[in-house]
Design a protein with these regions (language model features):
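Hydrophobic alpha-helical transmembrane segments
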Residues: 7-15, 38, 66, 70, 109-130, ...
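Cytoplasmic juxtamembrane regions at transmembrane-helix boundaries
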Residues: 136-145
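Hydrophobic alpha-helical membrane-insertion segments
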Residues: 69-87
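Transmembrane alpha-helical insertion/packing segments
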Residues: 1-54
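Short, membrane-exposed interhelical loops at transmembrane-helix boundaries
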Residues: 96-114
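Juxtamembrane non-transmembrane "cap" segments at the membrane-aqueous interface
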Residues: 82-102
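Cytoplasmic juxtamembrane interface segments
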Residues: 44-71
Length: 145
């Protein structure tokens, strides 16, 4: 059974984000908000890799590449959120999330699920932004007259 390129690249996004956050946690930098923004690089890499694989396979239609890019990014986001939920409960559940949320845009004391749902919406929004940016980039590269 062949695994789809979207799942392969979505899993690469998940692995990159997971290793990055585990490394930040081990180094004691998990509370530095600005370092968390670098996870966008892993999403950009995975989505760009899917689009490049499509182009290599001869798929140059914008809509098909958009679907592939969105699937790739959403798989990475969903796997990352599931990993965050598991990791949060292993680290103490709500108490761990409350230590993270001190530097995040939450009011009050969010639970693991509240935190995860908010990050899910943020991830879906970033999926749309990353997909559109890369599609515009590749569309300009592939235009032939």
């Amino acid at each position: 059974m062949k695994i789809s390129k979207e799942f392969q690249n979505g899993f690469l996004i998940f692995l990159g984000i997971a290793i990055y956050f585990l490394l930040m946690n081990l180094l004691g930098l998990s509370d530095v908000f600005y370092l968390r923004l670098f996870n966008t690089l892993f999403v950009l890499y995975g989505v760009n890799r899917s689009i490049m694989m499509n182009i290599h396979d001869g798929e140059v239609f914008l809509v098909n590449n958009a679907k592939s890019a969105m699937k790739t990014s959403l798989i990475g986001v969903f796997l990352s959120i599931i990993g965050l939920i598991v990791f949060s409960y292993l680290q103490g559940g709500d108490q761990y999330v409350q230590s993270l949320s001190k530097t995040f845009l939450f009011g009050g004391n969010p639970s693991v699920m509240t935190y995860s749902i908010c990050l899910l919406f943020e991830g879906i929004a970033s999926t749309v932004v990353v997909t559109m940016l890369l599609l515009l980039y590749w569309n300009n590269r592939l235009v032939t007259d």
